[in-house]
Every structure is written in C-alpha cells, then in structure tokens.
C-alpha cells in the first residue's frame, strides 16, 4: 500500500531545497508499477507541495497517460532539429487523438540559437501551435549536466538559467 509516509521516505531533498522522487535504479523495477500507483503518488504529492513536476519518458504508456490526465499543465519540450520536431508533432497528434485538452499543453523549444534559423512562426506552422517559451542555447547546460547539477544552480547568471527561471515564473503566475 502506498502511504504518505512511504512516499515521504522515498523523497530526496536536493541542496537547492527541491524534493525529488527519483525513478527506480533498475529499469526492471518498473515492472510492478502501474497507473494506479502513479495516481496515488501524485495525489499524495499534490496534497503536500504547491508544485509537482513530473519528468516523464518520451514514450506513451498507461503510466504516462495517467500522469498526463492528472496534470494541470503539460510542458512539451522540443529542440529545433527535424527529428525532434517530428517526434513533437507525433506527441501532439497522439494527445489530440486521446481528446487531451490542448490548452493544457505548453510548447517549449530548448537550445535555440541563430544557427538553426527556425523561427517561432515556422514552428507554429509545422506543429499547429504557438511556442510558449524558447530557452536559448547555452554551453553551460552541458557543463552542468556533466556535474549532475541544474544549470540554474551551477551557473545562475547564464542565459539559459535566466530563461528557465523566467519560464518558471510565467508558468507559476508568480511575480
């Protein structure tokens, strides 16, 4: 049985003050997890925290579907390369086929720079939706990833960090 106490025991507090419920260490540990478990965990977390952010895999299954159903907002992250945009279009089409409320989806483009020459209007035309936010390309992201730290912690003044913080304010409605 999944209890509040069990969920709290499984949380890890990052030194930034954010609580994280890490994924199982071994992929085989997911075999016994089902959508009802995710629903219960999300329910417990939403009673305890103001914001619950789920980093789901890029595949659709019953667990991801249930998490999406429970979400008040879905941030769909893409890059401007054609493979990513194609996958993003497939994800949008899949969600549309599930009658998922399209107003819940916020499209975020990651690692934008002038070299890509893909403008937000072109992305809107390709994907059929506005770009909610664009995070600029920043080499500090790769360095932060190698350190195992969020870029907003390792380099808070980096362009990407500032953009991510502003996006968080825009999403939360705070400020």
Locations of regions flagged by a protein language model:
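Phosphate-binding loop that captures ATP/GTP phosphates
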Residues: 1-20
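A short, flexible beta-alpha/helix-coil linker loop
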Residues: 25-28
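Acidic-aromatic/histidine active-site loop/patch
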Residues: 105, 173-175
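A short, amphipathic alpha-helical segment
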Residues: 128, 165-173
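C-terminal boundary of histidine-terminating zinc-finger modules
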Residues: 147-164
């Amino acid at each position: 049985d999944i209890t509040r106490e069990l969920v709290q025991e499984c949380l890890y507090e990052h030194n930034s003050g954010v609580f994280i419920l890490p994924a199982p260490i071994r992929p085989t540990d997911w075999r016994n997890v089902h959508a009802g478990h995710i629903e219960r965990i999300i329910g417990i977390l939403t009673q305890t925290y103001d914001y619950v952010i789920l980093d789901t895999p890029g595949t659709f299954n019953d667990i991801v579907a249930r998490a999406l159903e429970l979400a008040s907002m879905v941030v769909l992250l893409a890059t401007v390369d054609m493979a990513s945009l194609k996958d993003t279009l497939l994800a949008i089409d899949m969600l549309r086929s599930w009658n998922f409320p399209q107003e819940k989806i916020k499209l975020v483009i990651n690692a934008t720079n002038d070299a890509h020459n893909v403008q937000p209007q072109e992305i809107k035309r390709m994907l059929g939706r506005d770009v909610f936010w664009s995070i600029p390309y920043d080499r500090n992201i790769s360095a932060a990833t190698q350190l195992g730290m969020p870029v907003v912690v390792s380099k808070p003044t980096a362009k990407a960090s500032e953009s991510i913080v502003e996006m968080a304010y825009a999403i939360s409605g705070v400020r």
